[in-house]
Amino acid sequence: MNTLLNRSVICAVFLVQLSPALSAEPAATWPAVTLAPAREVTLSGPLGESLQRGVARLAKPPYSEPWLRADVSFEINRIFTNYSGDASGRFIELATLTSPPGRLSPPALAPLLKTVASFQKPDGHFGVAVDLSKPLPKNAPPIPMLWGNARLLVGLVTAGQQLHDEKLLAAARRLGDFYVDSADQLCSPAREADYRSSGTYGDGYTCCYFPAIEGLAMLYQATKDDRYLKQAERMAEFFTKFDCLPVDHSHGNLCAWRGILDLYEITGKQEYLDRAKAKWDAAVKGGFVWPLGGVGEHWYVCFSGDEGCSESDWLRFSLDLWRFTGQTRYLDIAERLLQNQYATNQCPNGGYGMAHIDCEAAGPVAAIEKVDEWPFCCSFHGPLGLHFLKGYLATGSERGVIVNFAYDFKAPVKAAGQDWLVSVCNKSGFIDGRNSKMEIELAPRDKATARGTLLVRMPGWASGAKVIDGSGEAVTAPVAGGYLRIEREFKAGDKVIVEFQNGLALEGRRFQKMQVTAGQVSRVKDVAVLAGPELLFASPVKGGGRPVLLATLDAAGKLGFPTSGNNLVTVVLPGSDASDAQIAQAVQFGRPVFLRTWPGIVASRHGDPAFVSVLEMGDIGKSTGVKPRRLPFMFDLVVVPASSLAADIAKLAARAKEPQADQAAPIFGTDLEKRPENWAVSQGWKFMPQGLLVSGGDIGLIDGEGYGDYRFEFELTIPKEGQGIAGWVVRAKDEDNCLMFQLQTADSTFKAPEFKTRPNTLRPHRRRNGQWEIAEPVALPKEIHKGEPHQVAVECRQGTVEVFLDGQQIYRQSKVDLRGGSVGFRASGPTEQGLFRAVSLKKL
């Protein structure tokens, strides 16, 4: 290692500009935009494949006609029928919009459309009979009914218009009349306290009532009946009393906001647009929008999962804000969402649901490779967002043809009085050393050639752009208002090639771009690493929290990792304050950590991940029985000059090329407490000259996989500062499935009968899927005290585990159901402390 590392500069970071999410191009003169007709747009590539899989999901179980209709007919017992019209309305909307021309698909759609209106109540609503004059506590019958009716109203209007079906539109009118007629009971300032009493989650008034703004606005556009518009505006005004961040249900909140933008489109009232822009800004600046580009199911800074419905709404909300303002920051966030969080939310069967997230107080830090399908909502709303996206890929205005995204698609566009066919081919390569390219063909529909203006969005992540024609000649393309402007003659077959310069970039949690200084060591915390619009995910990384990774910076200021190119490879460091020697040791001996974008994560899988489709309440939170990968995307980095690692990189690169590098070999040896790079470091672990002090962080394990039979041995001193308890782990399949033993000293003062604590004992534990099972304590053959060193050994052979204290066997267990797994230490907090020395692991 170069001694330059000694001259480290802690947190040598400064903000260089507001990110695309926070910087805005003025768009006071932004003209009206004509969206491409989504039905006529062909979307291919990965996004097109995701949409196709989502639509194909509609033809699979459980989506039979009775299952879908049950939330209005109650003919079968299934999950969430009290949300009357929710699943049926969503299915009707998506299936109608995506059915092939001249045919209704899937087969359940046609009979559902014929029968759904027959279950409408005389007052126009669907579902159980309700008395709206009664109080509305949480989950009162009218509340979930209102949610479902709002989704069904959208479905009925969509199907009525698309299919020119007057019976469906008549049913939509009757449902709209219900909202108008019930306004004095459901939209009354005098009942505000009553409404608030139900909270803001999916069983509360705030979540379930206001989404109908969208359906009422659509009904007005279909009928031009002012009553529906007035009711939607009345609800939008009343909504101001309830809107807030954080809020317990992002999907319900965003449905209301999309409806408010519909009102802006209809009325042109600036207040609606201003309110929507302010909401978006508050969410982004407040940390309620995650580095992944989307939001949580509960719209909090930190929550343990997202919801495909919410990601769809956030996408459409951002797209429409661009449509009405021209500010490309909204498209930058939409692209971030599509490339990251939207992709993580899709299940192997094509459905969408809740993707699990690992959080800390500041926000998410890692994706958990587990998605629970929610077939009652997200599996409709997820594909719906991608369907509407098609209309925004390329659009038209009086200024010309606007290309917003570098995806693979063909779209008919009308711009400045001319009909065009826009074809885009994506050639992006974000982390393999190539710049991102897109090939654009702009062909006039009614003539051989035509002069026109092509506007191509300049992504916020791009540091520059080069434009050439098909023969390689440079094309003039000045940048204004976030777009490259290309004016020329266009004809079928001619291509314009746009190449965006991109590299790795650092970004803070609130989308602020960050830089580190060349020629010195920088130590930065809580950052994401981006390749273009795509976050990098790290694997394999054990333990919780943000891992500390090693990064490099060359003399030109280019960010990288020890091994760059097609594969980004680095190592975990013992801490942000890692010394020169610790960095050198990690590079020489540490387990390779691969940094991949989400497509790379998918490619690295060994088969599809297990998932649960939630078809009944008991499925919520159900385990798949398979431990999912934890994939951090927020890191602490130690950034060193690239030249300082030149001598050590070859060893790391060689290890990264070894077969099964993602599944590291077992680690055996002595003095393992002196090799922090081989441990999944947890908070509360301190690697010191006198040993490894463990005083918190729950379980930490040694790296490696494929452990069989072994002898785990160490010298243990239980410090006087704690309460006389220290623990270690063997046969650890993972942190949630292992054997754990605790020693409690004779002078221990800790008393917790529920945990069977007892002085001067060994306490065996079994952790099964995260739950502790505690056996009866075993009395020690002699007294041990705090501050005394003792030799501990554990031998694991097949299904037998033996524990030795100072050479004497004190415990033996046979028929252990864990036949493999690594070793480690455990302390739940400072009351439990252990100082471990001479740690060894020997293969038997």
Question: Residue locations for each model-derived region?
Answer:
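Secretory/extracellular carbohydrate-interaction modules
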Residues: 696-766
